[in-house]
Structures are given as structure tokens and as C-alpha cells.
From Swiss-Prot:
PROSITE patterns: INTERLEUKIN_10. InterPro entries: 4_helix_cytokine-like_core, IL-10, IL-10/19/20/24/26, IL-10_CS. Gene3D superfamilies: 1.20.1250.10. Major immune regulatory cytokine that acts on many cells of the immune system where it has profound anti-inflammatory functions, limiting excessive tissue disruption caused by inflammation. Mechanistically, IL10 binds to its heterotetrameric receptor comprising IL10RA and IL10RB leading to JAK1 and STAT2-mediated phosphorylation of STAT3. In turn, STAT3 translocates to the nucleus where it drives expression of anti-inflammatory mediators. This is Interleukin-10. The gene is IL10. The keyword Disulfide bond applies. Disulfide bonds join C30-C126, C80-C132.
Length: 178
């Protein structure tokens, strides 16, 4: 009986302590998000560095998939939507194909995808960074070019992932300053 009373007290104290923090946990994570962003981008870059050589060696095309127009969309009024669509594009179209390119890189691509999912989740929790609904023409151009490249598209998209990270950084830096 004594241990169940102790357990009830612990549950009650945990609940009381968690209750005030529940409303502010999201706010706190949003407050600290700008400070955590460099670490999140570093994690993305570190994860990408494990597969970068593999995909860049297989990318035999000279043209860029991620063009300057995409960066301009990231910096413009469509920045939120462009970022959201590009994250979705990489998670749903590029990463699943990239994982199947070689068994030796599958875990590394998976890790890269998990880091990107974590970033997306944090962006969605902090509506100030991802409050959007419009479509980006630049993202549509990226998707069309990717599809036209067929099997070579995966190498192109993955070999340029570092450019995507730089665009994310440019967008987030702009949002943090505003």
C-alpha cells in the first residue's frame, strides 16, 4: 500500500510539473529553435557527407537540378512553400530511390532522411518558420527536371543535396532575422 501511495504521489508531481510546461514546451522549443538550427544543419551536412562522394561520382550530368530560381523562391514570399515542398520531394521521391542504390549506403541515406524529417517536424511545430499554402514554380521545375532525367535523376538530386542544405540555411537565416 505504501509503494502505491508513493507511486501516486510521483505521478501527481510529474503531472503537476509537466502541466505548466506543456503549453510552453512548444513555445520553448520555438524560442530555442534559431539557436539549434546550426546544429541541425550540421547534422544534415554530416549525414550527407557519408553519401556525397557515392552520388557525385555517379552524377555524370553537367546541369544543375537545384537552380538559382529555387533559392530566389526560398528567399521570396514563396519561401515557406518552396522549403516545405522540397523537403517533401526529397523525403518522398528522392530518398526512397537513393536508399536502393547500394546496400552500403542505405543506412546513411536513411539517417539523412531521418535528420530531414526531424527538421521538418521542428519547422511545423514553430509555425513562424513554416506558415504556408501557395505552390512554388521553381519546385515544380525541379520535380519536372528530376522526372525527365529518369534513373539519372536520383544521382543528380542526391549529389546536389548540399545545395539544398545551403538553401534551407538561407531561408532559415532570413526568417530568424525577421
Amino acid at each position: 500500500m505504501h509503494s502505491s501511495a508513493l507511486l501516486c504521489c510521483l505521478v501527481l508531481l510529474t503531472g503537476v510539473r509537466a502541466s505548466p510546461g506543456q503549453g510552453t514546451q512548444s513555445e520553448n522549443s520555438c524560442t530555442h529553435f534559431p539557436g539549434n538550427l546550426p546544429n541541425m544543419l550540421r547534422d544534415l551536412r554530416d549525414a550527407f557527407s557519408r553519401v556525397k562522394t557515392f552520388f557525385q561520382m555517379k552524377d555524370q550530368l553537367d546541369n544543375l537540378l537545384l537552380k538559382e530560381s529555387l533559392l530566389e523562391d526560398f528567399k521570396g514570399y514563396l519561401g515557406c512553400q518552396a522549403l516545405s515542398e522540397m523537403i517533401q520531394f526529397y523525403l518522398e521521391e528522392v530518398m526512397p530511390q537513393a536508399e536502393n542504390q547500394d546496400p552500403d549506403i542505405k543506412a546513411h541515406v536513411n539517417s539523412l532522411g531521418e535528420n530531414l524529417k526531424t527538421l521538418r517536424l521542428r519547422l511545423r511545430r514553430c509555425h513562424r518558420f513554416l506558415p504556408c499554402e501557395n505552390k512554388s514554380k521553381a519546385v515544380e521545375q525541379v520535380k519536372n527536371a528530376f522526372n525527365k532525367l529518369q534513373e539519372k535523376g536520383i544521382y543528380k538530386a542526391m549529389s546536389e543535396f548540399d545545395i539544398f542544405i545551403n538553401y534551407i540555411e538561407a531561408y532559415m537565416t532570413m526568417k530568424i532575422r525577421n
